Amino acid sequence: AMKMSFELEIGAQAPLGFWDPLGLLADADQERFERLRYVEVKHGRIAMLAIAGHLTQQNARLPGMLSNSANLSFADMPNGVAALSKIPPGGLAQIFGFIGFLELAVMKNVEGSFPGDFTLGGNPFASSWDAMSEETQESKRAIELNNGRAAQMGILALMVHEELNNKPYVINDLLGASYNFN
């Protein structure tokens, strides 16, 4: 495989430019780069959903029961990492089974497209996406990539602070805004 240069790829932009401190792409070809970019985009999307879910669950809960057999209501579920310890084993198996199904059967990258294109030939926003200039599409992809990177750091920070002192919302502490977490 021929050694490639990735300084001009989407996401290699100010202020860091191309940043690969672990050298994951030191001897990589375009195929390896695209595989790692695919993984980065997917993890970024999951992290953006995780941040939204963490903040939503902190302020609102669904009515009703999560598990009748375990006598567990949605209101009884803790937020954050602690929720994993309350989900019944059968529920965890369902969650991981569904994730596995999505990973193996549904969320496939469109061949010949950019990493992270999961349109599967049925993108409901295709007409608006296709109407954008190539420059605008690249800008949107760079924005998504950077928001995903920020969300990955954000959800990691929430989990670390939750484990350190059960106070994940550092900004509330800095501003003196009280909150109850779990």
Curated annotation (Swiss-Prot):
GO terms for cellular component: chloroplast thylakoid membrane; light-harvesting complex; photosystem II. It is a multi-pass membrane protein. It is found in: Plastid, Chloroplast thylakoid membrane. The keyword Oxidoreductase does not apply. Coiled coil: none annotated. PANTHER family: CHLOROPHYLL A/B BINDING PROTEIN. This is Fucoxanthin-chlorophyll a-c binding protein D, chloroplastic. It comes from Macrocystis pyrifera.
